[in-house]
Regions:
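Phosphate/nucleotide-binding beta-alpha loop and adjacent structural elements of enzyme active sites
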Residues: 1-240
Length: 240
């Protein structure tokens, strides 16, 4: 009776109370994958203010994290958050892609949706607060050009890619780095949310051809009205 009453109170506040299950916990599954593959270095591409790295640290991850972020405002917050762990390294402010030079990035009202690519109406309808409100010039480089600065031969590397439609370009600029990488977490879109982006079916084939296998799927972004899934994270690892 007491348990039911507590559940009702919690649900009235907009939350739910469930028994912890390591099989249904995203952080627990990621931690298990990291343990199996002995991951000790994570490339956090598209770090924003460090949300992913903070989540990893809260989940018990103890290895190195190397974060990359192009937006100046988000980068400043990222620097502050990184002081919470001595193994969290912040690269110079830059975007990661398949070229070296300068680009213009569009800044979203919700900065996590900012992108080099133009946003589609589908995205804006799905999340009205995501519309672009500004832009800034940024530096862009390839992982292949900078890997020796950050990576060691003994590293067991996992790369997380959250770049709002620019995922293929990141992989194309890391062709010589990818053979050293054990696993990938990458945001994949079911519909065109950014103009010119590659959709999930093309990305799945591309990543599998690189020698990875799909291990898990994490829902990421839904249309607020229809609840249709628009984006998910694919978790890939090389075969053991």
């Amino acid at each position: 009776m007491i348990k039911k009453t507590i559940k009702k109170i919690i649900r009235a506040l907009g939350f739910d109370l469930t028994r912890y299950n390591h099989n249904s916990s995203e952080s627990a599954r990621i931690s298990q994958f990291f343990s199996i593959y002995r991951i000790n270095t994570i490339l956090d591409v598209g770090a924003n203010t460090g949300q992913y790295a903070l989540w990893l640290l809260e989940s018990g991850y103890k290895g190195r994290i190397i974060s990359f972020e192009p937006l100046s405002k988000a980068y400043n917050h990222l620097i502050i958050n990184s002081k919470k762990d001595p193994n969290w390294i912040i690269a110079p402010r830059m975007a990661i892609g398949n070229e070296e030079g300068k680009k213009t990035i569009n800044i979203s009202g919700n900065s996590v949706f900012s992108s080099i690519l133009k946003m589609t109406e589908t995205h804006i309808k799905g999340a009205p607060d995501s519309a672009y409100i500004d832009s800034e010039e940024i530096y862009i480089n390839k992982l292949d050009n900078i890997r020796e600065t950050f990576l060691k031969n003994e590293d067991n590397i996992f790369i997380k890619i959250d770049v709002q439609g620019y995922e293929l370009e990141v992989l194309e600029g890391a062709i010589n780095t990818l053979p050293k990488i054990k696993g990938i977490q990458i945001e994949l879109s079911l519909v065109h949310l950014y103009e010119g982006q590659s959709l999930y079916h093309n990305m799945l084939g591309y990543i599998i051809n690189l020698g990875f296998e799909l291990y898990d799927i994490l829902p990421v972004f839904r249309d607020k009205k229809s609840r249709r899934l628009l984006q998910f994270d694919g978790i890939f690892f090389r075969s053991l």
